[in-house]
Curated annotation (Swiss-Prot):
Localization annotation: Membrane
UniProt source species: Mus musculus
Protein name per UniProt: Testicular acid phosphatase
Organism placement in taxonomy: Eukaryota, Metazoa, Chordata, Craniata, Vertebrata
Subunit-level organization: Homodimer.
Transmembrane segments: 393-413
Active-site residue list: H40, D288
Length: 425
């Protein structure tokens, strides 16, 4: 019998059963594979607005042009690369090896340059300042923006995605929030010279982007751009992002956006393991929208925009437990998010799974957000699923195996054919 006052420490049969049924975190084993998705570094504003007091001096303030990577952005990516070198020093070879690391970027100057700066920190021999005899340039792969469905997504070209977005923006809670900001957007339109009421919220976001970039570079903001105004603009931006990656129909949106990248990451790992390839790391240099869509697909969007050089890591590890336990799962997935250089990276947990998460459970939980095998509907037909986004090294290995299989098949077929024709074996 329990002593008085000790009832709170008694575990009943039902509670014990619930505890046993809860997903359990597995001990982390050796690192097998890493996928990194990071935002480009600090850049110039993407645009200006009619009454921008710094508009006339733009060519002086941003000598490389609007939207281009700044010196601070280069420094941020160099520092991120050095952080990655420290974290994965024991996992990666000291020098770049093409069979171990693959880098993909969107086809924008700022992301291509960010990838190069990052690699200069990760592999110092890739730094332009290295002695000429030691300098080893590292390839960064890309595809035209119009063809990029891995890191840019079919947002503008996909009718089905626009149907889903329209459903979100016509929802009662969205319209109610928007109505509450009508007076604010009217005043902001008067201040900026832009028409903002009844227009896509991205136009208001561009004002916020310009102000944030200018403030970060020590420029004076207009008197109307108070902290309260910037805070309200951030809230409007968060509403717009939720409409793009959140409910309703968040899973179907993800199948056309971040779920494509998530599926490619899982496919790259599984093929690497199945084929016994030496590939260890895949790096994606992209945008805040890429990370936001990926967070949406994982159910991890928290209302905040990823800062410059923010990085999400998918770390696949072998479990140290016996593979015959439970469902035979012996691989775990850990999600790491680095969004602040002054603090250690944050461990993330996919809803419904402990950290680290068993790979099978991770695949099960994220399946609704990933494109089905036949692809996700877009133009009345189907967008292809992940195979086109697979790292070419893996695709090449599959092709080689296919050729070998075909060759072996022909060798096996030839004697039977010759026998049928009465020829010699």
């Amino acid at each position: 019998m329990a002593e008085p006052g000790s009832q709170g420490h008694t575990v009943g049969p039902l509670l014990l059963l619930l505890l046993l049924l809860l997903p359990r975190a597995l001990p982390e084993g050796p690192l097998l594979f890493v996928a990194l998705v990071f935002r480009h570094g600090d850049r110039a504003p993407l645009a200006s607005y009619p009454t921008d007091p710094h508009k006339e001096a733009a060519s002086t303030l941003w000598p490389r042009g609007l939207g281009q990577l700044t010196k601070e952005g280069i420094r941020q990516q160099l520092e991120l690369g050095r952080f990655l070198r420290r974290r994965y020093k024991a996992f990666l070879s000291p020098e770049y090896k093409r069979e171990e690391v693959y880098i993909r970027s969107t086809d924008f100057d700022r992301t291509l340059e960010s990838a190069q700066a990052n690699l200069a920190g990760l592999f110092p021999e890739a730094a332009p300042g290295s002695p000429e005899t030691d300098w080893k340039p590292i390839p960064v792969h890309t595809v035209p923006v119009s063809e990029d469905k891995l890191l840019r997504f079919p947002m503008r070209s996909c009718p089905r995605y626009h149907e889903l977005l329209r459903e979100s923006t016509e929802a009662a809670d969205y319209q109610e929030a928007l109505e509450g900001w009508t007076d604010f957007l009217t005043r902001l339109g008067n201040f900026t010279g832009l028409s903002l009421v009844g227009e896509p919220l991205r136009r208001a976001w561009k004002v916020l982007d310009t102000l944030i970039c200018q403030r970060a570079h020590g420029l004076d903001l207009p008197s109307w751009a108070s902290p309260d105004v910037l805070r309200t603009l951030s809230q409007i931006s968060a509403l717009d992002i939720r409409a793009h990656v959140g409910p309703p129909r968040a899973a179907e949106k993800a199948q056309l956006t971040g779920g494509i990248l998530l599926d490619a990451i899982l496919s790259n790992f599984s093929r690497t393991q199945r084929l016994g390839l030496p590939l260890k790391m895949v790096m994606y240099s992209a945008h805040d929208s890429t990370l936001l869509a990926l967070q949406g697909a994982l159910g991890l969007y928290d209302g905040n925009t990823p800062p410059y050089a923010a990085c999400m890591a998918f770390e696949f590890r072998g479990s140290s437990r016996e593979p015959e336990e439970e469902d035979g799962e012996n691989v775990t997935v850990s999600l790491i998010y680095r969004n602040d250089t002054s603090r250690p990276p944050l461990p993330l947990r996919v809803p419904g799974c402990p950290a680290p998460c068993p790979l099978g459970r991770f695949q099960q939980l994220t399946a609704p957000a990933r494109p089905p095998a036949h692809g996700a509907p877009c133009h009345g037909s189907y967008e292809p699923a992940s195979p086109p986004a697979t790292v070419p090294l893996l695709a090449g290995a599959v092709a080689v195996l296919a050729v070998l299989s075909l060759g072996l098949g022909l060798l096996a077929w030839r004697p039977r054919c010759l026998r049928a024709l009465g020829g010699t074996v």
